[in-house]
Amino acid sequence: RTCLEGLRVLDLTSFIAGPFCPMLLADLGAEVVKIESAEGDPFRMAAFAFAGWNRGKRSLVLDLKTSAGRDVFLDLARHADAVVDNLRPGVLARLGLGTEALRAANPRLVHTSITGYGTDGPLAPLPGFDPSPPTTRSPTSYQTFGYADSCSMASPTPPGASAVNAATFSVV
């Protein structure tokens, strides 16, 4: 028996920071169902990384833009313990699947949303992938690509490691 056996998680994530959290839950025994559109997760282009970040998960194709897809998702949410997404703020609400709709379907459901810039404020609607946040609001944004005139403010130099993506799961 594992420590999270019996826990059911719906995974609406892609790329790195999003899938890492549900991956850890699956590693600890939770049943994780990754929901993808018919086009699939764009991170599938990195096959080995995709397989690693999505190990231990079941996969289900749903078109959340249709009423049938939304109905199936809400039925799954009625029997789930958590939903994890890394969509831009407001995307699920526009689909009729925001936190209020999820809680109406299942009042004990935990909804975790991983965003690049939070849920409100001027940058909230923007997609954010590491190193986007560190290069827009940190000393990294002042680094240049080695130009002689360091005041030229050339394109930001991202950090070598994907620190934000790797650390996000510890906050979630």
Predicted regions and their residues:
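Short amphipathic, helix-prone segments within low-complexity/disordered or flexible regions
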Residues: T144-D149, M153-V172
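N-terminal helix-loop segment corresponding to the beta1-alpha1 unit
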Residues: R1-P139, Q143-A148, V172
